Amino acid sequence: MAASLQAAATLMQPTKVGGVSARNNLQLRSSQSVSKAFGLEPSASRLSCSLQTDLKDFAQKCTDAAKIAGFALATSALVVSGANAEGVPKRLTFDEIQSKTYMEVKGTGTANQCPTIDGGVDSFAFKPGKYNAKKFCLEPTSFTVKAEGVSKNSAPDFQKTKLMTRLTYTLDEIEGPFEVSPDGTVKFEEKDGIDYAAVTVQLPGGERVPFLFTIKQLVASGKPESFSVDFLVPSYRGSSFLDPKGRGGSTGYDNAVALPAGGRGDEEELQKENVKNTASLTGKITFTVTKSNPQTGEVIGVFESIQPSDTDLGAKTPKDVKIQGIWYAQLES
């Protein structure tokens, strides 16, 4: 009996060992197949991961792409700074502007410029007589606002401003009679054209000042070296404009704040807010002729205008705005 059991045990031993070996071989093959599936390769008691290599290559490509993007961004910055460094475009004559196409003018700032004169004399050389001024153009080159300085207790003075409006502030296509007297005096009366433009500038302290650049109802007379006159400055807002509380001059609510019984001292302030005032104010402008060409009928010069800013329909005290620039006109007999 013992002998038979020993023989059975002896016969069972190889089978057990063989089963373990087969199982180990199966596990090894499975591990190898899984490793190949995930890109793992056995090599000299260590595994090298091809996936890790791919990740390194991907990271290197991302780094190279970032370097290229940074270089492109720096190049764009240089291009932009170079464009800004060029400043305003070259001033062209009237014929040069007319010879350009829309796409050649678009985005260059030329449409906001007054033409210049090629040739001529540095004085007003037109003979006495009656002319018709057309293509009258006024291009501001400087906006200053009279206000208190940034420093404490500084006296009010004309402060430099930052323009907040796009290049749409030039007055153009103005026309009217232009007369040259025998004594050398000139007279110009504005009749028609684009004679107003809404402009907003910002003071150094951050306050924004809107105003209506205009020369409405202008009748200027004097010597060509300096002829000036007062002109009309309409309200920046019309009577039908509604404020945030629905109050207007000719429409909207009469008031949006309950009026107190009185005696508080703020009745005047409440009245300014509730009762809208669209009355026009006045400004003064001075023209100076710097060059003329009687053969082409062109004349150019400089101007200085001082006019009030927006009053917010009577709620604010207007500020003085000084506008300096150049002007151009064509005179036809």
UniProtKB/Swiss-Prot annotation:
Mind listing the UniProt keywords for this protein, alphabetically?
Chloroplast, Manganese, Membrane, Photosynthesis, Photosystem II, Plastid, Thylakoid, Transit peptide
Name a biological process GO annotation. photosystem II assembly
- Gene3D superfamilies found in the cross-reference section: photosynthetic oxygen evolving center domain (3.30.2050.10), Photosystem II, cytochrome c-550 precursor (2.40.160.30)
- Which Gene Ontology CC terms are recorded? chloroplast thylakoid membrane; photosystem II oxygen evolving complex
How far does the signal peptide extend, from start to end residue?
none
Similarity comment: family membership: Belongs to the PsbO family.
According to UniProt, the name of this protein is Oxygen-evolving enhancer protein 1, chloroplastic
Per the UniProt record, the source organism is: Solanum tuberosum (Potato)
